[in-house]
């Protein structure tokens, strides 16, 4: 017997706070269908505690559950921790009395090395790859799309004279150095560096691979990167545009902080040359951003520190001007590696007239530096399109659902354990147990070597999912694959073999590289048409932010389904992040503007999936009526506003409960359910003005959560459930 259970993940920041308010509603309703909704804490704080055996390892438990047919997991956004975030969480846990060690910057002892290994496993995007035992099906639900068309979000106008542009490398990057092979047989591989002095260093051993698996190797060359950055910094100064860099230091937790460090060092080249010894003496690490370097300077003698700080200010003055993250606090694009994440920052800029903010808090044309050229054309073509045709119009634009390859840590997003900053010149080789060299790349000191894996079963599953979505929608379906790229050529061979086994009669299926696919898709978007994108793991991430942000104003409103390969379901609540600024506003003035629409959508499909899997008709009914209620929340404008004095996240949860109860009371297919929910619908409707008044009354004052990464449950419940009337109605139900 399949258990009637849904796991609702407790995560971080704004979505975690929203859970304190929404979950009691969900549990009360689901209980009437015999469905238990249980939480598992996979927040950053909980994962740190689990790493040192101070809490259950809920993530490992869910990783195992995801490999079973019973899995029904609702996954909310979580923090992909950068080192500064990780250190802040550790400090908070230590202050609460938990015996977790400091994060060791430069581990010396065996104990410190063990702690560093444990923390490195928690760092970056450590959650999603464990749960994603399937591929991704992301699309804008019809109700959300129609709402966006009738209530368009703001889109900054584009000038045909815009000087904004993408700068990317033309050689010496991962894209241009990639080599790839498909293995005929299962094997155990090792990655080794054969230095020019004759020594061999094993970088990784015991790497198990399956028959049919694709292995890639590529190198980001330090010398080429430095030359490229120096050239682009000078060019931004000459063109008088803002300089900005767009990486993904959260997910690409080994390679991208190193690349980010090179950007910091190149921009402040004079400072790092003149004060090399002084900076080294306090362990200043550009990979942690300018913010980290400035913090380290505090340990220098006052006079020296002032000299370095003045040199930094002089660099700012000579330009180019840097794009700002928070101009009021002087936080630039180069302060924190995790502040500017390419898949969120580029769509935001494209939506804002192709501009970013300068130190004077004005929008300005910008150079968007995306060093590796693998996917940069997505953004350069979109910028060219907006320059030629103006901003997109949400009232008429089409839609771009995505079928994304991500199961079993496919491609770059599973490469962290196979990414190395090279210490000595030589050749990095990928070798099997018989000593056969499968792949090799020449390297110099400071180069970043990266190997990726893509297993056969996920590719087959991805192609089948693409065909199912093409069949269900009738929309043209584009595989974003570039036959001139080593990895993509291997994938294409598999795709063609899989399609030969499928019924594709009457389907329109195209194969285009990133540049061609972007042009083709944008032309159709401007005509109001639907185009399915079938992409690898990185483009899945990029496209499911870019198009939802342009179409809907946010990627948090996407339906994000992961049909797990063993038959279960993972339902992700949108494709956005965890909104730290929303938490800051809540703490300051007890107003949470987080929109739980993503949770509503995911819960609806989760309940319908459970109903189908188990024959629980009432669970299915809860799902369909929740969809109806969600539509009403949108149409009657009950989503959170932005400012104090209007309803926020908590108010939207009250209206969802009201409309959901009313939909259940009004339906005729389950008379018992109608009778059960009728009284609740009546009492909530009667109490509406009282509940809204209670919710608004708390706004405008600071709120105490008793923590940030590790909040106090009772305090946070009190903050997030301030309406005694609403709480009593749910409790008596």
Regions found by a protein language model. Give the residues of each.
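Extended, well-ordered protein cores
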Residues: 2-261, 270-494, 498-520, 524-650, ...
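Short, charged/polar, low-complexity loop and linker segments
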Residues: 660-669
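Short, charged, amphipathic alpha-helical segments
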Residues: 674-682
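C-terminal accessory extensions/subdomains outside the catalytic/core fold
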Residues: 711-733
């Amino acid at each position: 017997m399949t258990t009637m259970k849904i796991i609702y993940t407790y995560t971080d920041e704004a979505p975690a706070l929203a859970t304190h308010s929404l979950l009691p509603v969900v549990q009360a309703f689901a209980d009437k269908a015999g469905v238990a909704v249980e939480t598992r804490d996979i927040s950053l704080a909980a994962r740190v505690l689990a790493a040192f055996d101070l809490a259950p390892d809920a993530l490992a438990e869910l990783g195992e559950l995801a490999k079973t047919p019973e899995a029904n997991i609702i996954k909310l956004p979580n923090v992909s921790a950068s080192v500064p975030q990780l250190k802040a969480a550790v400090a908070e846990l230590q202050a609460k009395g938990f015996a977790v060690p400091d994060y060791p910057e430069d581990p010396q002892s065996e104990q410190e090395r063990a702690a560093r290994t444990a923390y490195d496993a928690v760092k970056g995007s450590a959650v999603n790859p464990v749960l994603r035992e399937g591929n991704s099906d992301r699309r804008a639900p019809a109700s959300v799309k129609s709402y966006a068309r009738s209530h368009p979000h703001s889109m900054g106008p584009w000038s045909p004279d815009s000087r904004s542009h993408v700068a990317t490398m033309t050689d010496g990057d991962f894209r241009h150095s990639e080599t790839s092979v498909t293995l005929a047989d299962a094997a155990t591989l090792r990655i080794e560096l054969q230095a020019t002095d004759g020594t061999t260093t094993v970088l990784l051993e015991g790497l198990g691979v399956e028959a049919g698996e694709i292995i890639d190797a590529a190198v980001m060359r330090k010398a080429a990167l430095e030359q490229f950055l120096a050239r682009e910094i000078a060019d931004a100064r000459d063109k008088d545009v803002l300089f900005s860099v767009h990486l993904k230091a959260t997910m690409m937790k080994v390679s991208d902080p190193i690349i980010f460090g090179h950007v910091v060092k190149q921009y402040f080249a004079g400072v790092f040359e003149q004060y090399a010894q002084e900076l080294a003496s306090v362990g200043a690490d550009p990979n942690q951003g300018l913010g980290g370097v400035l913090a380290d300077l505090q340990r220098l003698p006052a006079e020296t520190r002032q000299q370095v700080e003045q040199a930094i200010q002089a660099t700012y003055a000579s330009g180019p001007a840097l794009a700002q993250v928070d101009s009021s606090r002087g936080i630039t694009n180069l302060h924190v590696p995790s502040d500017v994440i390419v898949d969120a920052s580029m769509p935001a800029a494209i939506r804002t007239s192709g501009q970013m903010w300068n130190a004077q808090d004005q929008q300005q044309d910008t150079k968007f530096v995306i060093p590796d050229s693998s996917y940069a054309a997505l953004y350069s073509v979109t910028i060219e399109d907006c320059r030629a045709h103006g901003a997109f119009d949400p009232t008429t634009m089409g839609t771009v659902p995505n079928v994304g390859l991500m199961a079993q840590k496919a491609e770059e997003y599973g490469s962290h354990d196979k990414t190395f900053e090279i210490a000595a010149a030589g050749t990095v080789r990928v070798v099997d147990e018989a000593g056969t060299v499968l792949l090799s790349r020449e390297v110099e000191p400071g180069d970043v070597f990266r190997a990726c894996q893509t297993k056969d079963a996920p590719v087959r599953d991805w192609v089948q999912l693409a065909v199912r979505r093409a069949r269900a929608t009738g929309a043209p379906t584009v595989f974003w694959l570039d036959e001139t790229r080593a990895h993509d050529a291997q994938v294409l061979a598999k795709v063609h073999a899989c399609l030969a086994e499928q019924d594709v009669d009457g389907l329109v299926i195209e194969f285009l590289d990133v540049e061609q696919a972007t042009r083709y898709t944008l032309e159709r978007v401007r005509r109001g048409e639907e185009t399915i994108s079938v992409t690898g793991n990185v483009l899945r991430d990029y496209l499911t932010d870019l198009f939802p942000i342009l179409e809907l104003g946010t990627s948090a409103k996407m339906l994000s389904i992961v049909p797990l390969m063993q038959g279960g379901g993972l339902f992700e609540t949108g494709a956005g992040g965890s909104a730290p600024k929303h938490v800051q506003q809540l703490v300051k003035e007890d107003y949470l503007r987080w929109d739980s629409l993503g949770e509503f959508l995911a819960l609806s499909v989760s309940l319908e999936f459970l109903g189908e899997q188990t024959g629980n008709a009432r669970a299915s009914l809860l799902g369909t009526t929740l969809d109806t209620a969600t539509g009403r929340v949108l149409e009657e404008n009950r989503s959170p506003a932005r400012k104090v004095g209007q309803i926020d996240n908590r108010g939207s949860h009250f209206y969802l409960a009201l409309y959901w109860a009313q939909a259940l009371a009004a339906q005729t297919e389950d008379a018992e359910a109608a009778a059960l929910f009728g009284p609740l619908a009546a009492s909530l409707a009667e109490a509406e003005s009282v509940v809204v008044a209670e919710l608004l009354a708390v706004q405008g004052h600071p709120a105490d959560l008793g923590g940030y990464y590790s909040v106090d449950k009772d305090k946070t419940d009190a903050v997030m459930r301030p309406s005694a009337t609403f709480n009593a109605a749910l409790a008596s139900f």
